[in-house]
A protein has these predicted regions:
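Rhodanese-like catalytic fold shared by cysteine-dependent sulfurtransferases
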Residues: 1-38, 45-78, 84-124
Length: 124
């Protein structure tokens, strides 16, 4: 597991104070109920290529702010962001809210939490 610096954790905690989070179990339950979720994987492209949540779209943290308006023009669309553990997705969620998106959730635990539960992944 990656060891994060105190300063990085400080900005993540700051972002988390302004965003809404969900967890892997809630996302899985919603998918099992047949809900159509807009899942965005904000990890690096190489991480996404290895595996990702079924149906997820890739918009890496480095480009999401640049490309989101073209991909998701409706600011009210519910978006569930995830990354490796929930840190990068919290930062990205905070930025999207600053851009006017009103229905953003960051999945706490990220794909590691999803994987640890044995939930299905798409490979490749």
């Amino acid at each position: 597991m990656v060891q994060h610096s105190a300063r990085f954790l400080q900005i993540v905690d700051d972002a988390r104070s302004r965003i809404k989070e969900t967890d892997v179990d809630t996302v899985k339950q919603r998918l099992d109920r047949g809900e159509k979720l807009f899942l965005i994987d904000v990890r690096e492209e190489s991480e996404f290529a290895k595996d990702h949540l079924p149906g997820a779209t890739h918009l890496g943290k480095g480009i999401i702010e640049r490309d989101i308006e073209e991909r998701v023009p409706n600011l009210a669309t519910e978006l569930i962001l995830y990354c490796g553990g929930g840190y990068r997705s919290a930062l990205a969620a905070d930025n999207l809210q600053k851009m006017g998106y009103r229905n953003i959730l960051s999945m706490n635990g990220g794909i590691r939490g999803w994987r640890d539960k044995g939930y299905p992944l798409t490979h490749g």
